[in-house]
């Protein structure tokens, strides 16, 4: 077996995107002879770090947690919102075994299918498109009685914006010819997370026994009456719609929120036999399903169970007897360890970690170099002593100084990074090692909002650089994403990628 160059260094320049526009672009403005030389002379290109390419909704800017998860996993790691949306688009949602089992059992017994959740397009806890899909699933599987218990938003959406969402679901039921909205209540009651059980009790009694403070003929009338009482969406009081509906033994109940924290309390009331927070008038025996896992302690199946990431890069390197070093300063240490390892806290066998403290300043524009020089000292030392097969480093400057919105400081941050990259490349050349230079998402390449002229402190959807430093004659293919980086590293290391890694090498 031929020996591969050692070490292979993955440099993650956090928040270092690429923009063709020179406007407010700290990367463009900075004096960066090393990166300019690499860009002109070695294999390089751009890869995507945002939207569906990293498991987020279309057009959504990337972030450090998601970026490092994708970089280390070697596959697109879909977030819960996106997992559900993608399953609906692909048609898989309508065959989901957990939901279908609950619905089919209820249908076979002539029972009702109830589903509940936050009815809005906020996309933080739920999405109305998911509720529409649930209505369609119940209809397709033969349910005659389909009831939506709608929780109104007004926090992740404007305070009085529920009318359009109600209209959408009313239209869905009308088109299906089956089903209706059975109740309305504000999320203040149904989605408490502070153990205010008096609020949760009102939601539970409304859903299970149809007991509302108010009854309205239609959901729209119920909403209008709430507004007339001075309530905004979040605080709409328990309102039963039409003939009050009850949840009976044998019914299916599906909670359609994908975010866990505000779904736990109401779920507990439905499924805990020894529940003691308030006295339930009834606890019907239902087929209860959560869209995701709300807590391990809640005895209910999840339609989209948490995916455990097997054979992430760190794990696979360990299985193949490779040594690795993870290094970052405080601000990004969790990203280069926990998130890069697919949500695992403990180091893998043969993995060592170095944490360099971030400087104690109020904001990093006051010290744009942060602790990058100290991080670089330790990497150069590790390269020279040849102890590790792989070194993964995060440089926090582009992101943390980018968030300050101070252009001059961001330029200094990029210039500092250029010096650090130069030192690492020089050390690698001495020992015959290799490097990949990339980023997790954009930020520092846009420091002002073009429309307002104000400081731009957020991430961007710009692509990020991908640079190969080494002696092999390789080319960078187009269309790469963050999930392709780990398979690229395995190719350089002479290792077959595991089946779980669906990314493909960027170097060809």
From Swiss-Prot:
The keyword Nuclease does not apply. Belongs to the BPG-independent phosphoglycerate mutase family. It catalyses: (2R)-2-phosphoglycerate = (2R)-3-phosphoglycerate. The lineage of its organism: Bacteria, Pseudomonadati, Pseudomonadota, Gammaproteobacteria, Pseudomonadales. The keyword Lipid biosynthesis does not apply. It comes from the Bacteria. Mn(2+) 1 binds at residues 399, 403, 459. This is 2,3-bisphosphoglycerate-independent phosphoglycerate mutase. Keywords: Glycolysis, Isomerase, Manganese, Metal-binding. It is an enzyme of class 5 (isomerase). Pathway: Carbohydrate degradation; glycolysis; pyruvate from D-glyceraldehyde 3-phosphate: step 3/5. Catalyzes the interconversion of 2-phosphoglycerate and 3-phosphoglycerate. Mn(2+) 2 binds at residues 14, 64, 440-441. SUPFAM superfamilies: 2,3-Bisphosphoglycerate-independent phosphoglycerate mutase, substrate-binding domain, Alkaline phosphatase-like. Its cofactor is Mn(2+). Substrate binds at residues 125, 155-156, 187, 193, 259-262, 332. Monomer. Pfam families: iPGM_N, Metalloenzyme. Its EC number is 5.4.2.12. InterPro entries: Alkaline_phosphatase_core_sf, BPG-indep_PGM_N, Metalloenzyme, PGAM_B_sf, Pgm_bpd_ind. One of its GO terms (biological process) is glycolytic process. One of its GO terms (molecular function) is manganese ion binding. The active site is at residue 64. Binds 2 manganese ions per subunit. GO terms for cellular component: cytosol. CDD domains: iPGM. Coiled coil: none annotated.
